[in-house]
């Protein structure tokens, strides 16, 4: 079994270019960079990114911080978008339209609102059909780039703009959705 070599990982080429508009120290940026570093140098990546903070901060047409192929899609369809791209890739490879030695990886990024709620149906379908893709949910417990509203990922008793805490409310009354179990 091989061990994780931090120096080796950190020396890999950056696939998320500097100059994006993410906040300094943002967890999404750190997570994206870690996921992309897991790729081999020779891998080609196709990234689908649901509308959200990561998308609006890393891709503002005509500027993009993404070094790999990048698709911006709506909140609800990162799973559907990437499953379609992955299927097209498999068909083209099978028909000999793509070189056999090229390796593509398919990665979707979505926030908790776009994953747990709005995009759950398309993600569920992609997983049920066993598409060869990785879906990364950036979970910060609320719809952060639209005013901190509560998705089903918000923990019980959390204070959001739609579940405020105070004299008349204790915050969100429901348990957080257990997405991994579903």
Model-derived segments and spans:
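A structural motif
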Residues: 171-182
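Internal, well-ordered alpha/beta segment that forms a basic, Gly-enriched binding/recognition surface
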Residues: 162, 167-168
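ATP-dependent adenylation/pyrophosphate-handling site
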Residues: 139
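Cofactor-binding active-site loop characterized by glycine-rich and histidine/acidic residues
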Residues: 2-135, 143-144, 148-159, 172-173
């Amino acid at each position: 079994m091989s061990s994780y070599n931090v120096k080796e990982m950190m020396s890999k080429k950056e696939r998320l270019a500097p100059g994006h508009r993410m906040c300094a120290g943002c967890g999404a940026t750190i997570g994206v960079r870690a996921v992309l570093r897991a790729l081999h140098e020779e891998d080609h990546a196709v990234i689908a990114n649901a509308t959200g903070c990561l998308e609006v901060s890393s891709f503002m047409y005509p500027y993009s911080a993404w070094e790999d192929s990048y698709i911006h899609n709506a909140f609800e369809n990162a799973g559907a978008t990437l499953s379609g791209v992955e299927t097209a890739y498999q068909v083209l490879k099978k028909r000999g339209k793509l070189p056999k030695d090229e390796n593509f990886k398919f990665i979707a990024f979505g926030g908790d609102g776009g994953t747990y709620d709005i995009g759950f149906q398309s993600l569920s379908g992609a997983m049920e059909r066993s598409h060869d893709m990785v879906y990364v949910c950036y979970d910060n417990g609320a719809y952060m780039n639209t005013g901190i509203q509560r998705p089903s990922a918000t923990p019980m008793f959390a204070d959001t703009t739609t579940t405020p805490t105070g004299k008349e409310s204790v915050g969100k009354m429901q348990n957080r959705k257990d997405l991994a179990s579903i």
